[in-house]
Amino acid sequence: MSPHDDAINGTGDMTDRRPLLAAQEGIWTGQQLDPDSPAYNTAEYVHIDGPVDSAVFDTALHHVVAETKALNVAFVVDEQGQPWETDAPAGDWHLHTADLTAEPDPHAAALAWMDRDMARPVDLARRPVFGHALLRIAPEQYLWYHRVHHIALDGFGLSLVARRVAEVYTALTVGEPVADSGFGTLASVRDEERVYRESARFAKDRDYWADRFADRPPVATPAGRTALPARTFHRRVVDLGAVQTETLRAVARDLEVTWSEVLLAVTAARLHHATGASEIVLSLPVMGRLGSVSLRVPCMVRNILPLRVTVTASDSLRELAARISRELRSGLPHQRYRYEQLRRDLRLVGGQRRLSGPGVNIMPFEYDLRFAGHPSTVHNVSAGPVDDLSVNVYDRAEGAGLRIAVDANPDLYDEADVTALQEGLLSLLGQAVAAPDRALGELRTREAVPVLDGGPLPGPVRPVLGLIADHAAQRGGSVAVEHDGRSITYAQLFGSARDLARRLAARQVGRGDVVAVAVPRGIDAITAILGVLLSGAAYCPLDPTAPRARKAELLDDARPALVLTASAHAADFGDRAVVRLDQPEPESQEAARPTAPAPTAPAPEDLAYVIHTSGSTGRPKGVEIGHRALAHFVAGATHRYGLHHGDRVVQFAALHFDTSVEEVFLTLCAGATLVVRTDDMTDSVPGFLDACARLRISFLDLPTAYWHELAYAISTGAAALPAEVRTVVIGGEAALPERVDRWRKAVGTSVRLLNTYGPTEATVVATVADLHDPSLAPGDVPIGLPLPGTRAAVVDGELHLLGDNLAVGYRGDRPPDAARFAPLDAVHEAPRAYRTGDLVRIGDDGQLRYLGRSDTEFKISGHRVHPAEVESALLAHPGVRDAAVVGQLLHDGTRRLVAHVVPDGPAPAVALIRDHLRAALPAAMVPSAVEFLDRLPRTSAGKIDRNALAAMAPDVHVPDPDAQVPDPGAETAAHDSTLERTIAAVWQQVLAVAAVSARDDVFDLGAQSLQVIQVANRLSVELRRDVKVAWLFQHPTPAELARFLKQQEQQAHAQVQPRPAGPGLPPTLLADAVLDPDIRPGGGHPRAAGTPDRVLLTGATGFVGVHLLAELLTSTDAEVVCTVRAPSPAAAAARIHQTLEIHQIHLSDVARKRITAVPADLARPRLGLDEALFAELTRTCGAIVHNGATVSIMREYATLRAANTESTRDLLRMAAVRSTPLHFVSTLSVAPPIGLAPEVPEAFLPPHTGLRYGYQQSKWAAERLLEQAAERGLPVTVHRLGRIVGPHATGYVNERDFLWSVLRAGVPAGIVPDLFEEETWTPVDHIAQALVHLSLGQRPPTATVFNHATTPVRLSDVYDWLEEYGYPLRRMPLAQWRAELRGSSGAFGAVATTLAFFDSWDADTDEATGPELRLGRVRADNVVTGLHGSGITCPSVDRDLVFRYLDHCVTTGTLPAPAGKQGHPAMPAK
């Protein structure tokens, strides 16, 4: 029979069934992770030195198999998914035989046959689970191969069977009767296990391990990462000779330990050397049979003992072996407690969670087998699956020595790694045994440190400014930079930069200085950085849209001579010296220019730029890059990338990312054209690529996170790569192998895909890999080889970078960080190196592969994030006592941050924590998940146990992006819900949360800008249509986005072009505006007239609401129950008191005691109150003031209906029980504009086409509900407010007000729009006083509408007062204002929000004039009548009051101080 025949198989019948042994359950679970994997096959072959009678051997085998119960079973699953063991007699299986003596290498042919048989998966539901072969390799040399699934036998069980086969074969051969096997029964093992689990010993063992691993120590492995067991493994076998083995045994006796404990000590020391970990946790397989009936039963009972030991470099072999011996003596008595159960106990199941690391399997079995007198040797083929590394040690018989086989998971290590690990282990073993009292750290294996060299630079290195100057002189007419329809030639660019350099020199800026550059993306930004460099100074880029606190922190670190920025952002920099690029210099500075010294060209040792990264100390750190490093990088990267002057390169990154250095300087130094992307280019991936095609882009330099989405879209056919693109460069974080494979299949090798790696400290990029290389295997994503002029050394697995591209160091005094720059003694001449903290390995092809980090640093969307910096921001929150942040790698390869917070009292709302962090940190550093704990876990040394926190992070299942989803295009009645599910599934995947419901606002779940881009891209692919990023911002719930997309689809089918002049009302709006028939005055006792003792107030933490609260407490004696969005009453109260302080409202302690804070949520049924509390408030509150609402000028009705309309319905239901008066705060914007109605009555309004945006619509619907309630006899009032401005007393300004948003956007740029002629402005303190008097002063009639309208304020007067205050303004039509504002400052922050509001009206209005915001005459007769005789009068809004508002804005930084003064004289002293 040929050795290439199929592997042995068969079938069998099932009879009864039995539960699996605990050890078998672990094997079963592991097999289900990959049912077709052969990893759980275990096998040996016995080399028999002598003739073998194959027929007798076959008889002996059948005899032993028949008497071995574990080999006559199958494994089945019941309807509940529970596995069972059933009887399945082996039956007619056969011994495979083959004569291989004719093969060129019979022994090799036999091993090859075994490899093929081992690669066949076993069907556990069929019999048999084993196989045997007898292979003849010489006339009297045979190999008996026996393979069995690990669920049936462990290694010791396999040895029992082998010994029994030798015994039976010998008896049959010599003609003696076959003795009884002496095997025990499986039933006895099962009974023993049951008794153990019910015993006190089980509990004692459990307690021992739970205590030993309570802190869940980190698991250190040379790979630095995890992977599932592969279907194969790398193996390297070395025999330790008899003399070496005897020396080992002798030293062990001298040390009073066993030889296996010496091997364990050396292995632990070797892992300590490779990982630097202070604790090593080994996986030690144990028989678990001593003193057990299983000692004579072939079965699977093997367990894993996690051996935890501290290792230091100063340990000697004597000390470490003794420590391990003590640990073993402590743990072995508890070895029966199952390893799998301990992992469950410690919540270390799934994901990256591990209990122990590399395995050391010591097999001292007596294996002296003789077959009819002929000797044999046993060779292990496979000991089972390999998670990471396994060191298998076989004690061979008759003094033959030890065999050491190192097995490794090929998904984590290559063959070179295995060789290095084994040789290092044996080298350390030899030295340690020779000097057992010498520190093991001194015996560190002196393996040659591998150094990769990028080779020489292609020619002399020239300064970047010199290269750009040459292009300006020689190719001055060529386009250097394009942006949004504008372009500038090299001559113009260099001339503008030179003018700026002279301007800076006039301010005494030059060599040795740093200039901060906070300029939005565009031509001005490129001019700014070149101008700074030409002045001799270094530039420090800042994100102009970053929170002010963040910018202040970076400026404190950078210590710039001045700040270059646009007028729109100048106010953010306080009293620092500022140069406004969009404004001419003051005359004094202009006059100084001719006498100023000429700019001095920088020297190679001067700084070129300072760029900030996240810092391990909790503060960002500025990395200083010199001109020499920048020039070397440009020379090496330009050569490696093949960039030339004919290329057109997208400038994608913001300046404060160091990728911008690569984009800008490589392009300009090559004489190519830099095309600066616009904001709308990234609305969708297809849109981005279409724009690239229109712009004739040939070279794309993209963040890896964005490229992931681009690769996905291209691979699915949702987008196409422009034909002009010839090179794509990616970098910033590890590329996902799945995305790389998609790209290769879709794009092939026609376009170069370069994967770059490099920390900021090595000037952007240090290594590059060609991912389009067809020789790369699927899933292989190297980071490549060093750039020319750069070298890379790998020391104990950590990457060190060498060369002239290294940073000067860090800004300021940073000893811990500066230690990363140091001479590398392991390399010849000890050159200066940067220790990256990145773990890598060198593949067989000589290229680097990234493995992970050696510290806690994490990459999120290209941002380097040190947890300490996020933790520092968290601890600044008043409601946080302690905090720790960990990075979580999800199943699909994406990453997120998880914050673990110990609250200081009641837990603050997660949304408030996120708001706090957004004010201090970049968006990518705001954690996606926040978990509250009573305390943080800590190690025995008192440090935060980050491994325990990582294990506690929510184990989120992320759906497969390729998984089948319901067809969103199917025409069914459930179309909308199907589409909702599709949208929710994509959000769930990207946000990495357990679930996203149709009504979840994804921004409340932590969505960030890059994730919105990802979702827009994946929905475009899934729905086979373009989904724009802006739509996701406008429709933040799956339900609303589904409705919006459906409406668009219907309009497209109906070919509605153009859209009607006035948008129709949302289809749900009119239905929502119908009051439930059961809401009507009930039979309860009606309220008594007069001021109530208890008032329910919603919205007390808002601008109007906090003043209403103050007025209720001042003018009445009532208790005020305030509903507040908060997790607890204490947190709700804290929010109220904080709001009072912010608005400078001072109340007596007596008044404050009348505030009752109730946690609630207007967007939930019954306001989020439980039935009991809702009923109590219904019974006890004598009036309801419904002021709370979600106010947004951008959001659609569907996202506001719950909080604004449905909450009103719930409060009407409360009011109806006892006819409790309900006073509703509405808005004059519900009224039709002047074009539809010349007058606004004090009456309820019918629907009209002026209800254009969600907030209007939600308030109108609520009024309709109140109108119907009034018709049924319920006492209600409606208070419509116009523009509510700050209190007359303090001049406080509500920055969220729409008009103030317009002023914040336009005043710094010196431009304001013509919006309307006039509108009502009412101070908030007057509104509060009037509303409380009108609502509670007397029992109202069944329905009264109050239009709170005062004397109108003319917008032209407001603009005049602004100019009088000191702001030079140009007034212009809205369309012009929008265009100039977008061009002068970019669409960022408040500017972006304001512009987005007007953008949302474009389809429905005349863009030349904008939306119609004017109202007709506002009737306020009811207000006048109601306030008559009360003494309440509204103060006028005049120049003095507006000046007080402006004083407040300047003081708080809402607006910049006018040029030449620090504010109006009326500004209060500080």
Swiss-Prot record:
It catalyses: 2 a (3R)-3-isocyanyl-fatty acyl-[ACP] + L-lysine + ATP + 2 NADPH = an isonitrile lipopeptide + 2 holo-[ACP] + AMP + diphosphate + 2 NADP(+); 2 (3R)-3-isocyanylbutanoyl-[ACP] + L-lysine + ATP + 2 NADPH = (2S)-2,6-bis[(3R)-3-isocyanobutanamido]hexan-1-ol + 2 holo-[ACP] + AMP + diphosphate + 2 NADP(+). Keywords: ATP-binding, Ligase, Nucleotide-binding, Phosphopantetheine, Phosphoprotein, Transferase. Its cofactor is pantetheine 4'-phosphate. PROSITE patterns: AMP_BINDING, CARRIER. Residues 584-603, 1049-1070 are annotated as: Disordered. Transmembrane segments: none annotated. Residues 1049-1059 have a biased composition (Low complexity). GO terms for biological process: antibiotic biosynthetic process; lipid biosynthetic process; secondary metabolite biosynthetic process. One of its GO terms (molecular function) is transferase activity. Its EC number is 2.3.1.-, 6.2.1.-. The modification O-(pantetheine 4'-phosphoryl)serine is found at S1009. Residues 974-1049 form the Carrier domain. Pfam families: AMP-binding (PF00501), AMP-binding_C (PF13193), Condensation (PF00668), NAD_binding_4 (PF07993), PP-binding (PF00550). Nonribosomal peptide synthetase (NRPS) involved in the biosynthesis of a unique class of isonitrile lipopeptides (INLPs). Catalyzes the final step in the pathway, i.e. the condensation of a (3R)-3-isocyanyl-fatty acyl-[ACP] to both amino groups of a lysine, producing isonitrile lipopeptides. Can use (3R)-3-isocyanylbutanoyl-[ACP] as substrate, leading to (2S)-2,6-bis[(3R)-3-isocyanobutanamido]hexan-1-ol. Contains 4 domains: a C (condensation) domain, an A (adenylation) domain, a T (thiolation) domain, and an R (reduction) domain. The T domain acts as a lyine-specific peptidyl-carrier protein, and carries a lyine residue that is transferred to it by the A domain. The C domain catalyzes the condensation of two isonitrile-containing moieties to both amino groups of the lysine bound to the T domain, a rare activity in nonribosomal peptide biosynthesis. Finally, the R domain catalyzes a four-electron thioester reduction, releasing the product from the NRPS and forming a terminal alcohol product. Belongs to the ATP-dependent AMP-binding enzyme family. PANTHER family: BETA-ALANINE-ACTIVATING ENZYME (PTHR44845:SF6), CARRIER DOMAIN-CONTAINING PROTEIN (PTHR44845). This is Isonitrile lipopeptide synthase. It comes from Streptomyces coeruleorubidus. The gene is scoA.
